[in-house]
């Protein structure tokens, strides 16, 4: 399926040569387009379940939603994963472990924050022992709201991450442009 909003397809060469059946583009744009497409359709998330949101995260891997058919395969090791799904209440004691696991992931790496506790502290926001959002520890690409969010909401968040990777608008590209 061709996305008509792609920057590769909407450049001046595509507009002028579309009717002739071929496309002229820069080689680097084509390589970026293909690599982003491949990355977005083969996500390997690592679960970082901390509370009740982890149960909903497990539902997405079960037979009803079956993320395997979308190219999403859960991994147990951070060295094999490229997506971290943080689900649940992040405490001050667990924050260094989250950062350590995030640092062990290979580039490019993405983070999905799942649930109101991971997004901003949730119900325990005013507790002395709770981090008020995992984005204070690791850069987050997608926020999935809810308490707990449904499996459909996480599935939608994964689809949004795939679209974001296709556009090239993720934390890995933001970091390289800031240097």
From Swiss-Prot:
Keywords: 4Fe-4S, Cell inner membrane, Cell membrane, Iron, Iron-sulfur, Membrane, Metal-binding, NAD, Quinone, Translocase, Transport, Ubiquinone. GO terms for biological process: aerobic respiration; electron transport coupled proton transport; mitochondrial respiratory chain complex I assembly. PANTHER family: NADH DEHYDROGENASE (PTHR11995), NADH DEHYDROGENASE [UBIQUINONE] IRON-SULFUR PROTEIN 7, MITOCHONDRIAL (PTHR11995:SF14). It holds the Pfam family Oxidored_q6. NDH-1 is composed of 14 different subunits. Subunits NuoB, C, D, E, F, and G constitute the peripheral sector of the complex. Its main location: membrane. It comes from Ehrlichia chaffeensis (strain ATCC CRL-10679 / Arkansas). It is found in: Cell inner membrane. InterPro entries: NADH_UbQ_OxRdtase-like_20kDa, NADH_UQ_OxRdtase_20Kd_su. This is NADH-quinone oxidoreductase subunit B. HAMAP family: NDH1_NuoB (MF_01356). It catalyses: a quinone + NADH + 5 H(+)(in) = a quinol + NAD(+) + 4 H(+)(out). Belongs to the complex I 20 kDa subunit family.
């Amino acid at each position: 399926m061709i996305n008509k909003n792609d920057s590769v397809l909407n450049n001046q060469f595509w507009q002028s040569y579309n009717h002739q059946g071929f496309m002229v583009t820069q080689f680097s744009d084509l390589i970026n387009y293909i690599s982003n497409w491949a990355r977005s359709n083969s996500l390997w998330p690592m679960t970082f379940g901390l509370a009740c949101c982890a149960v909903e995260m497990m539902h997405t891997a079960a037979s009803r939603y079956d993320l395997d058919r979308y190219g999403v395969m859960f991994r147990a090791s951070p060295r094999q994963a490229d997506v971290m799904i943080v689900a649940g209440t992040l405490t001050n004691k667990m924050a260094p472990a989250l950062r350590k696991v995030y640092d062990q992931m290979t580039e490019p790496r993405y983070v999905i924050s799942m649930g109101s506790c991971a997004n901003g502290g949730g119900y325990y926001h005013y507790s002395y022992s709770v981090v008020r959002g995992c984005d204070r520890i690791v850069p987050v690409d997608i926020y999935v709201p809810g308490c707990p969010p449904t499996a459909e909401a996480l599935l939608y968040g994964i689809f949004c991450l795939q679209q974001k990777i296709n556009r090239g608008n993720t934390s890995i590209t933001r970091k390289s442009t800031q240097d």
